[in-house]
Amino acid sequence: MKKSIITVFLTLLLIIQSFAGENNGDKKYVLVIHGGAGAVSRDIPESLKQEYIDGLNQALLIGKSILTNGGSALDAVEKVVNYLEDHPSFNAGKGSVLTSDGTVEMDAAIMSGIDLSAGAVAGIKNVKNPISLARLVAEKTPHVLLIGEGAEKFADEMKVQKVDSTYFFIRAQNERWKELKKKISEDKKGTVGAVALDINGNLAAATSTGGMMMKRPGRVGDVPIIGAGTYANNKTCAVSATGWGEKFIKNNVAVSISKLMEYK
């Protein structure tokens, strides 16, 4: 069976940049990223559009630096997503959209294709970089998914950086929340992610999100559900999905792509 290097499944309108197939000596590495910035109009000012593009390009450079220097795919996807979580233009970390209560609840997941080890967190409110907490779940616990208060307590034990909730309340998201609150509407777009193949032939995937704007508090989408929105297997592919999370969960999209490749 011919091994496919990377498969990335995306839905809806996204800003997507990819840097793929470069050689480092005789060995190839691949990096593909996506950045979900909520309901972005096609008519946004050029200056704002450039912020998204510049952010994605910088994220690519971060991942490229790691991979060209022999770093692991897992390190690359984590650091790329760290950067996107810190960038206010994207729906993850600092730029996370708000729930119907006007609060932030973030989800993230990371997976290694080497041994299928995975970690995920959901309902995170005060961790600056949820993707790094997800990696600690994979590496420091026998579990795969931690949620809410338990995940926050684990973050304290691991001395993960936390921030006050006001860190996440950027003006653009607050204004959009007020607008949607009046309309009693929902926004089903968002999420940032990365998949990578390192020079040793190992795959990894990472995904982080603030979820959908105006979601009911406690709602968890596909991102932290391994096999739905995030998956990596060295035998097949690495997947970071974005779109309407409930659809990905119902159809187990990420692992289904992998299985189709495996059994073809």
Annotate each PLM feature:
Residues M1-D26:
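Bacterial Sec-dependent N-terminal signal peptides
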Residues E22-K264:
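Alpha/propeptide regions of enzymes that mature by internal proteolysis
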